[in-house]
């Protein structure tokens, strides 16, 4: 059994659907992975059915799903050294909330050669009624044809080149020209 160590909530006033609270949780499962090793892992009992039944606004708002992800960060002395910063949280972007600025602090850029940034966004949509750009330090990111400059979270997956990653979006962008050695923060604007 794994319990959340951190929980992130976003309250959204969905007009006629009332206030909806979205959440994301985080747990460090490093020890479990080390103890179990290379094997098949199963996730079970992620049940949000009672939340959907008791709050019909989620279904009416077409945001009735749950998901999970596992980030694996490992060390291999045969590979080049990489600097990794992992940030977690939850924000909402939609037709009413079209812009967010996120400041990532406590970054110490040692090298920007081949630097990348990745995003996992839930509820990625290909067809939007407004633009959805993503910028790092004032520079709009894109990696066409998968991620155009005006639809960053479009239900795609950079790793598999999938264009039908329904209800999610997993993308990695090269940002070596958007950060500099010695930078201690990054400004993300969505």
Which role does the model predict for each range below?
Residues 2-61, 138-190:
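Cysteine-clustered segments with highest specificity for TGF-beta superfamily mature ligands
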Residues 63-66, 126-134:
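Short coil-to-beta strand junction motifs in C2/discoidin
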Residues 1, 111-124:
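A short beta-strand element within beta-rich, extracytoplasmic domains
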Residues 47, 76, 121-127:
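Short, flexible beta-strand-to-coil junctions
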Residues 85-86, 129-135, 145-147:
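Composition- and surface-driven signal marking solvent-exposed, interaction-prone regions
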Residues 112-117, 131, 183-185:
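Active-site lining segments that contact anionic ligands and/or coordinate catalytic metals
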Residues 88, 119-123, 190:
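Active-site proximal loops enriched in glycine and acidic residues that flank catalytic Cys/His/Asp
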Residues 17-116:
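A surface/extracellular/periplasmic glyco- and lipid-processing/surface-interacting theme
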